[in-house]
């Protein structure tokens, strides 16, 4: 049994725990510890009840310093210094680093020094980690010696499989991306101070442009795409699910039917369970709690002059990403154990 700890129990940390139980992967992995500075009562409550994803199917109880889920007892820790975490004593195989704060090798190696064998970061990281993985595209690069790995971002996981498919079939010359992302907890409920002046404004009242490094994230996964993409991002007043407007110029001449056929075939084949395809007239909330990284909306595919293709992609930026955290961590463990 793989022994897991979660460091940082916010939106992604809680989604990882719930996804573990809902996906059936609990038979392979067990969460034995959560390190979170919040009060235990709040930890239990937000595990049981969630505005976005609904009630957790399992009853959650607090007994002493443990969260009980059925027969599973998960130790709740409140340690701000990761070097002092009891990972050696708890025989932790892998830590999900989900604070959004520890984003480079040196800071994440605190978990290794504390006794964990591997760390998977739930965020884009600095370039000095052992690898940045988009599961389904490059997880085969994982090696036994890799100890600190990034799971990239939700939007990178959404867009890279699609770019990979298009490039393999038609060749991608260049592209431009607009991410239409649900509001996040680094924004304000009502106007308040923030270093980013746009993020001083109420999240529920505006479409808010924010910085994004998505184009650079694509390059890290697909190095041959260096300097071929640029991206912008806006936050919109919804609490979950993200849309990506992707425009690419292809080397080959195509039509809408050809593009959609190739993407649907990939969704049913190599990327089954990771990439999806729909031709139904759906809206963003229809993709809430969808475990896939990306869903192509075939009704919105457009082709101009044979080589300029516009696509609309959907993803649950919480749930899909949490499921890829599970997949990537299992691949890391498999690589380590040979």
Curated annotation (Swiss-Prot):
Catalyzed reaction equations: D-erythrose 4-phosphate + NAD(+) + H2O = 4-phospho-D-erythronate + NADH + 2 H(+)
Source domain of life: Bacteria
Binding site for substrate: 153-155, 199, 212-213, 235
Residues the UniProt record annotates as site (Activates thiol group during catalysis): 181
Active-site residues annotated for this sequence: 154 (nucleophile)
GO MF, one example: NAD binding
Biological process annotations from GO: glucose metabolic process; pyridoxal phosphate biosynthetic process; pyridoxine biosynthetic process
Alphabetized SMART domains for the sequence: Gp_dh_N
GO cellular component: cytoplasm
Compartments, record wording: Cytoplasm
Entry EC no(s): 1.2.1.72
InterPro entries documented for this protein: E4P_DH_bac, GlycerAld/Erythrose_P_DH, GlycerAld_3-P_DH_AS, GlycerAld_3-P_DH_cat, GlycerAld_3-P_DH_NAD(P)-bd, Glyceraldehyde-3-P_DH_1, NAD(P)-bd_dom_sf
Binding site for NAD(+): 11-12, 317
Keywords: Cytoplasm, NAD, Oxidoreductase, Pyridoxine biosynthesis
SUBUNIT field: Homotetramer.
Function of the protein: Catalyzes the NAD-dependent conversion of D-erythrose 4-phosphate to 4-phosphoerythronate.
PANTHER family: GLYCERALDEHYDE-3-PHOSPHATE DEHYDROGENASE 2
Entry protein name: D-erythrose-4-phosphate dehydrogenase
Gene name of this polypeptide: epd
């Amino acid at each position: 049994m793989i022994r897991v700890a979660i460091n940082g129990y916010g939106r992604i940390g809680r989604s990882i725990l719930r996804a573990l139980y809902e996906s059936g992967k609990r038979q392979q992995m067990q969460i034995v510890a959560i390190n979170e500075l919040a009060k235990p009562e709040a930890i239990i409550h937000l595990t049981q009840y969630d505005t976005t994803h609904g009630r957790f199917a399992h009853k959650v109880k607090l007994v002493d310093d443990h969260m009980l889920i059925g027969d599973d007892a998960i130790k709740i820790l409140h340690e701000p210094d990761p070097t002092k975490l009891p990972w050696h004593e708890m025989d932790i195989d892998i830590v999900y680093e989900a604070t959004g704060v520890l984003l480079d090798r040196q800071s994440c190696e605190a978990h290794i020094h504390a006794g964990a064998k591997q760390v998977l970061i739930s965020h884009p990281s600095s370039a000095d980690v052992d690898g940045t993985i988009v599961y389904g595209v490059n997880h085969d690069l994982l090696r036994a010696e890799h100890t600190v790995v990034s799971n990239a971002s939700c939007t990178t996981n959404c867009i890279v499989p699609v770019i990979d498919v298009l490039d393999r079939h038609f060749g991608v010359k260049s592209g431009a991306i607009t991410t239409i992302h649900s509001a996040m907890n680094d924004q304000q409920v009502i106007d308040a101070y923030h270093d980013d002046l746009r993020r001083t404004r109420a999240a529920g009242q505006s479409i808010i442009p924010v910085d994004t490094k998505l184009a650079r994230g694509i390059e890290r996964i697909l190095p041959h795409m260096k300097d071929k993409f640029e991206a912008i991002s806006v936050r919109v007043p919804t609490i979950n699910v993200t849309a990506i407007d992707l425009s690419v110029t292809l080397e080959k001449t195509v039509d809408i039917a050809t593009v959609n056929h190739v993407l649907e075939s990939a969704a049913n084949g190599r990327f089954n369970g990771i990439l999806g395809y729909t031709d139904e007239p759906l809206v963003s909330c229809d993709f809430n709690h969808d475990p896939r990284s990306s869903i192509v909306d075939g009704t919105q595919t457009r082709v101009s002059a044979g080589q300029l293709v516009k696509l609309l992609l959907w993803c649950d930026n919480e749930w899909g990403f949490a499921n890829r955290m599970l997949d990537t961590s299992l691949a890391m463990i498999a690589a380590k154990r040979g």
